[in-house]
Amino acid sequence: MKKINKMKKLILLILLVAISTSCEDFEGWNVDKKNPSEVPADFLITSVEYTLFLRMTSISVNYNIFKYFAQNVGSTTYQDEPNYDLRNRDIGGTLFIYLYRDMLNDLADAKQIVADNNDLASVKANKLGMIEVLEVYIWTILVDTYGNVPYTQALNSSEFLLPAYDEDEAIYGDLFRRLDQALLFLEPGGVSFSDADLIYGGDSDMWIAFANSLKLKMAVRVADADAGMATQKATEAYNAGVIMTSAGNFAYPFEASPPNTNPLWTSLVQSGRSDFIVANTFVDLIVPLNDPRTPIYLDDNQIPYVGGIYGTNSPFANYTHIGTKFHESGLEGLLMSSSEVSFLLAEAVEKGLIGGDAEGFYNSGVTQSIEYWTGSSDDAAAYLAQPTVSYASGEWKDRIGTQKYLSLYMTNGFESWSSWRILDYPLMNIALESGLPVPRRYVYPNDEAQINGVNYEAASSAMGGDELDSRVFWDITGAGNAGAGITD
């Protein structure tokens, strides 16, 4: 078995190298799903899962800058990205390519290969359902990051070399439909890709719970834009069963030895560089709360803890470093946890989307996060007993927003930023050198205006411009505390 696993990893590595060296021009991401690759579907699934967690959990600006958007970290030297300059290194273009070409394209290929093979009908249905769930998840990342994106004409260059952009709200509506269809395909107790699925081992029950949790997240996202849709979908998801324990976490098993190590280790240890310190935004929030996760989240190189001023050079030796737990090469990647789902349920109750006990869900979210990092339920109980932490329904956006933010530290900057855009908590700092607030979206790739100009202009105009402060459809100005969340 070990030899088989090693062979799979070797083939995966070869595939990843081939992908990374392919052309990154416009045709490179808008490929034709009618001409699938000759790679077996199993290897495509393994590759997509690895690529997804690599790109989304990394701290490297070559992959994403979500941990800057969440102000988890600051930079010791390079200040373009902490000050929200996405144009210099084409940050928007990099993520665009990875999501379309390296993930959605491979999943489209895998779907066609599975549809054409001779698997038993039940196995084929489970495989197709799993692929569809992954596709929907990746599409939500695209929409939540950019707003309007190519959708109906994407991945089909033989017919649409220059694809039109669909409206973000319309895409979400179709993604709900597709997720419901995927859940019909997934059979409780069924199996799909088995060992090729490194997240859930092909376990359909796990994928069903994740799909329902994703539906819940999408419903909470759209609540301020379409309360009716949000109520329907949140209720469906909750009643069908979401991730409730850490055993169901949407997590990836990075390995202790290269090449499949956690990308945080690559940037923080293997690189030999000292580029990152913890931002004052995070340090100033967690330390006064007497949070039991503090000695895990933060290194003790500076006592008392001192966060780097966000958006300006912060000498590595003078400020608090990222906790050594995040320097572990085999630390699992985490993109959805039972803790996050509990916070989503609390938010759904407060928004009137589902019935239930918001305080109970909130307490569960806090407890599960602390248990995940410290292993201590006693720590969680003592923490929740503090007046600054205990639930207060009249301040639910502050309490849920703050504790969800703390729970997502260094694991999922994207979700931390997305939650902040809805709840506007906790307070974020203005980037010191640029004077800019936290962006509401990524800008489009630098070359879209030249290559796909007509469609780019239409999409940008519909959103109020291709600007950092333009909003995706669910980020409603004036909803609740919208417009808050920023401090000098």
Language model region names:
Residues 22, 41, 261-288, 294-298, ...:
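Long, intrinsically disordered, low-complexity segments
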Residues 23-71, 76-77, 87, 98-101, ...:
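Membrane-proximal, proline-rich intrinsically disordered regions
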Residues 38-42, 74-375, 392-397, 486-488:
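Structured, solvent-exposed acidic/aromatic patches
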Residues 1-31:
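Bacterial Sec-dependent N-terminal signal peptides
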Residues 57-66, 147-149, 230-231, 415:
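Beta-strand acidic-aromatic groove motif in beta-rich domains, primarily in extracellular
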